[in-house]
């Protein structure tokens, strides 16, 4: 509990909060050339580059990522989850928030099974995360 003299020196300061996915919190109105703060769960974009990256120290792999120019004009790096993909330059993708722990600078994931992105083939468990359809039952 603060004393009166402590409160007289200055009131309590609210903690400032910074978004972990800033590109999803901005909307661009091209008609009026204005930027608005409006958060969205997903954003559509066009791939400008598809490449691989090596993860941070204890891990070793070639992780796939894409540079995506979003519909609000911001360009971000997005991780391509799952094994194998069909993405190339000019592919239209949908991105969601969520960083990859061992890839610095990647704060977004590409949603598999939407737009030009196909789902992961032969995926039987955790299918919804990778856009895979339910396998046909064999008799």
UniProtKB/Swiss-Prot annotation:
The keyword Endoplasmic reticulum does not apply. Residues 116-139 are annotated as: Disordered. GO terms for cellular component: small ribosomal subunit. CDD domains: Ribosomal_S12. The keyword Hydrolase does not apply. Keywords: Methylation, Ribonucleoprotein, Ribosomal protein, RNA-binding, rRNA-binding, tRNA-binding. The modification 3-methylthioaspartic acid is found at residue 102. One of its GO terms (molecular function) is rRNA binding. InterPro entries: NA-bd_OB-fold, Ribosomal_uS12, Ribosomal_uS12_bac. Transmembrane segments: none annotated. Residues 124-139 have a biased composition (Basic residues). It holds the Pfam family Ribosom_S12_S23. GO terms for biological process: translation. It comes from the Bacteria. NCBIfam families: rpsL_bact. HAMAP family: Ribosomal_uS12_B (MF_00403_B). With S4 and S5 plays an important role in translational accuracy. Interacts with and stabilizes bases of the 16S rRNA that are involved in tRNA selection in the A site and with the mRNA backbone. Located at the interface of the 30S and 50S subunits, it traverses the body of the 30S subunit contacting proteins on the other side and probably holding the rRNA structure together. The combined cluster of proteins S8, S12 and S17 appears to hold together the shoulder and platform of the 30S subunit. Belongs to the universal ribosomal protein uS12 family. Part of the 30S ribosomal subunit. Contacts proteins S8 and S17. May interact with IF1 in the 30S initiation complex. This is Small ribosomal subunit protein uS12. The lineage of its organism: Bacteria, Bacillati, Mycoplasmatota, Mycoplasmoidales, Metamycoplasmataceae.
């Amino acid at each position: 509990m603060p004393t009166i003299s402590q409160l007289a020196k200055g009131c309590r300061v609210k903690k400032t909060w910074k978004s972990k996915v800033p590109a999803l919190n901005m909307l661009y109105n091209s008609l009026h050339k204005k930027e608005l703060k409006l958060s969205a769960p997903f954003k559509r974009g066009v791939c400008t580059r598809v490449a691989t990256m090596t993860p941070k120290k204890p891990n070793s792999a070639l992780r796939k990522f894409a540079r995506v120019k979003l519909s609000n004009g911001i360009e971000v790096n997005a991780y391509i989850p799952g094994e194998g993909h069909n993405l190339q330059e000019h592919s239209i993708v949908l991105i969601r928030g969520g960083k990859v722990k061992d890839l610095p600078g990647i704060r977004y994931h590409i949603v598999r099974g939407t737009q030009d992105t196909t789902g992961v083939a032969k995926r039987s468990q955790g299918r919804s995360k990778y856009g895979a359809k339910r396998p046909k039952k064999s008799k």
